[in-house]
Amino acid sequence: MNRRLAMGSLLVAAAGLAAAAIGWRRRQGALPPQMALAPRVVLSPPDSIGAVYHLGHSLVGRDMPAMLAQFGGHGYASQLGWGTPLQTHWTEGEALPGYELHASGIPPAPARQALAADGFDVLVMTEMVEIRDSLRYFDSPYWLAEWAALARQGNPAIRIYLYETWHNLDDPDGWLERIDADLEAHWLGRVIAPAEATGRSGGIFLIPGGQAMAAVARAAEAGDLPGLTSRGDLFARTEDGGLDTIHINDLGAYVVALTHWAVMYQRSPVGLPHQMQRADGSVAQGFGPEAALRVQQLVRDVVAALPQTGVAPARMAG
């Protein structure tokens, strides 16, 4: 055997061992290594946004995109499932559990079909929570990159965002504690950074929904929001009247919609309307004027503090 063949054999063997090791780690449910996120560029403010695609699950829901569109005036479409990871959205499509399509101002369309065409200015994705399980078992960064690459084939100028969410209020590690810790450790360091490292995704920016929810919850519990006293005031109720520990109510949807708008439109949300409609046209529960103004200020401050959004802090002045 000559030297080239010998080296080739060694490389093949090494690759096989590496693949086996990766497979073993995945079977064991180990988290992938955390990566440093590349420095963010500051995005230019959009000239206009005509259409937005939302890909996710019930923490996107029907009403939050509808509120966002009321702020921005854009059309939107969404593909949702029950706690669906990005991988399952790709591999199962309309067969995924809880499959739903929604739209306003534009026709509804399955995600892969819609994004392959040049019809959307913005794609917002989110990942299944528990986020650690998405990373262990559903290869979040690979599928984030896959969706981003598809969207850029349809529209090379599309802006792509990952919507950071939250875990259950009764999470054993603490709800606020998880939001504080998971942003850098998981959403940025284990989802966005390795997705971008594939070289297929282009830049992916952050919509800090969890951070905004945490800021508003802290303000409520500090007595800084008239009419609210706890984080539970942002969450829905179950059919028997108990607290739904993961799904937001109209007030929570308003917080998240403000956050999306501030990032996507690169404008301070201070002064936006606080009386909104749900997706079905019914009147949403709203903050009072004083509380709404404070919530808008909190969201503005969250977005301004995070360069991962692509928003220059000066854009949040006001």
List the model feature ranges, each with a label.
Residues 231-318:
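Conserved catalytic region of serine esterases and O-acyltransferases that act on ester linkages
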Residues 19-31:
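Membrane-interface motif at the C-terminal end of an N-terminal transmembrane signal
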Residues 2-12:
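N-terminal export leaders
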Residues 32-66, 70-71:
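N-terminal module-boundary/linker segments of secreted carbohydrate-active enzymes
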Residues 55, 61-147:
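Conserved SGNH/GDSL esterase-like catalytic core that processes O-acyl groups on lipids
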